Design a protein with these regions (language model features):
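Hydrophobic, membrane-inserting alpha-helical segments
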Residues: 1-50
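Exposed boundary/loop context
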Residues: 6, 11, 33, 49, ...
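Active-site or metal-binding loop neighborhoods of secreted/extracellular toxin and effector enzymes
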Residues: 17-20, 178-223
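Short, surface-exposed loop and linker segments with low hydrophobicity and enrichment for Pro/Ser/Thr
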Residues: 24, 28, 36, 111-127, ...
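Glycine-rich short-loop/terminal segments
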Residues: 39-155
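ADP-ribosyltransferase catalytic core
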Residues: 135-142, 146-192
Length: 223
């Protein structure tokens, strides 16, 4: 469970700050870092040197001083409104998840290297959105995002933020039921776009109820 996970990390010299309000009295962890390997072979956070999660990469949090978001606070902030509505299963390295997708036919790593991907289970029915162009991409698919992360953005800004292969024209609603197991993390630069948004992947599962909303511009810009 989360408490056990945090306790284990604290025992190895890691400051766990942000998970369920737990604050361990140890040396302050500047940001999430990857190094130690957990029981299941997945990465956990430690004080190892190396590249880390980038400051300021969550664009929708522009009013927050990123220098104040450290360690587990950063990961909690990624969850946003979902923070108290999910169960955290694992922290995984972006590299391990990218390898998983490569083994399933993806030739472009979807998650930013040297960042943390969170494996979560939804505690309640949850509504996400999905954008698409109707040609290269469609209403149904395995990648979704939170509505608040794209509301007010132009299609071009959304394409840049989520490194999409084509400019989206439409938006759909995606309802995932309680108990759904998904992953979330930072979008890797792809197709010449910067990425940096927070995406959710359905882990190749055929789950969710998809419903058309309509024009992305009308929905996002309030037309």
């Amino acid at each position: 469970d989360t408490a056990g996970m945090v306790a284990g990390m604290v025992a190895s010299g890691v400051t766990a700050k942000g998970l369920n309000g737990i604050e361990a009295e140890a040396n302050k962890l500047a940001k999430p870092k990857l190094g130690d390997v957990g029981d299941g072979g997945d990465a956990v956070l430690n004080d190892a040197d190396g590249p880390v999660v980038k400051e300021g990469s969550i664009e929708q949090l522009s009013e927050i001083e990123y220098k104040e978001l450290t360690g587990y606070e950063y990961l909690d902030t990624q969850l946003g409104n979902l923070k108290d509505k999910v169960k955290l299963n694992q922290y995984q390295s972006a590299e391990s998840v990218n390898d998983w997708w490569a083994n399933n036919g993806y030739d472009r790593p979807p998650y930013t290297p040297k960042t943390v991907v969170q494996d979560i289970t939804l505690d309640c029915d949850t509504i996400f959105v999905r954008v698409y162009d109707g040609n290269i991409s469609g209403l149904r698919g395995g990648w979704v995002m939170c509505a608040e992360d794209i509301k007010g953005l132009t299609p071009e800004q959304i394409q840049q933020k989520f490194a999409l292969p084509s400019t989206p024209k439409y938006i759909g609603e995606v309802k995932l039921k309680a108990g759904s197991n998904i992953r979330m993390g930072e979008v890797n630069p792809n197709y010449g776009f910067n990425g940096g948004g927070i995406q959710f992947d359905l882990k190749g599962q055929y789950i969710g109820e998809f419903k058309e909303i309509g024009s992305l511009v009308d929905w996002s810009m309030g037309k």
